[in-house]
Amino acid sequence: MAGNSIGQHFRVTTFGESHGLALGCIVDGCPPGLELTEADLQVDLDRRKPGTSKYTTQRREADEVKILSGVFEGKTTGTSIGLLIENTDQRSKDYSEIKDKFRPGHADYTYHQKYGQRDYRGGGRSSARETAMRVAAGAVAKKYLKQEFGIEIRAYLSQMGDVSIDSVDWNEIENNAFFCPDASKVDAFDELIRKLKKEGDSIGAKITVVAQGVPVGLGEPVFARLDADVAHALMGINAVKGVEIGDGFEVVNQRGSEHRDPLTPEGFSSNHAGGILGGISSGQDIVAHIALKPTSSITVPGETITRSGEKTELITKGRHDPCVGIRAVPIAEAMLAIVVMDHLVRHRGQNFGVQTETPKI
């Protein structure tokens, strides 16, 4: 399996399975001198971890991260940062029924066909449990970006099923279990989740992630455009089936006179492009949206086949999220942070001394 790393200069490599002994990652390329403790990383891990809300899976993992290397006397050394989280609440017996059956809508069938075997306990490497290490690594990037450059990366739940938010109040996001910025929609989300639990079903969601304070100039055309790398990173999150930058697919219905973002001496007058032009950051907020599918781990019976190809039916047992989009909020933040951090380090290496006569707006 070769696809375990992301980034070029700021590079993250993860390892581990859902029901294995532990999850881990190596973070390469973090500059030396950054004050970093396990508590810095734990904040975002606690936002992502299971068992903290009645709306998500009741698997209870402490997700306590340990820094194994790369930090000395409270500061990064510039060497590889090793991070580890031990798994403590595995209930592998919940998955005994799917040992010889493929869960429809999951990676069971494709992993089995590709590798000739699979870890059926919670999906093994394909489980979203792996994203805990992405969040830990992303927390390193988030702290550096904010502390050194004033770049802040935040996300929120913007839609669940047919319920969409009408406004964004950043101060409201941490006041509810949905990471919802619109207090008037929390009750509707609550009602929807309760209904789904009774039905044994699930629902999809849309997450919006924003990077504020990103300087102009990040991105490496033509094959490492900033928007291309952002899309690649966000699309790599479990259950994501679509990524939009800026207005995304809404541009299909827009005229050029509407979509273009006029430049003025005071700055851009709109941000339909989502903060990226020609694959390079414009200095505006970088805005992306991801669509997450409804999980197939539900108690509604589904048609499938056995390892020998025989027709059968499956009801998924275990502890699962009725909407995986809720816990995807800190994951989206982490992936965007990793990409911005990587491009910042790349840009600094090649274009550090570049100056132009044009003022930055």
Swiss-Prot record:
Function of the molecule: This reaction introduces a second double bond into the aromatic ring system.
Transmembrane domains' residue ranges: none
Subunit structure: Homotetramer.
Cofactor: how bound: Reduced FMN (FMNH(2)).
GO cellular component, one term: cytosol
Main EC class the enzyme belongs to: lyase
Name recorded for this polypeptide: Chorismate synthase
Name of the gene this protein is made from: aroC
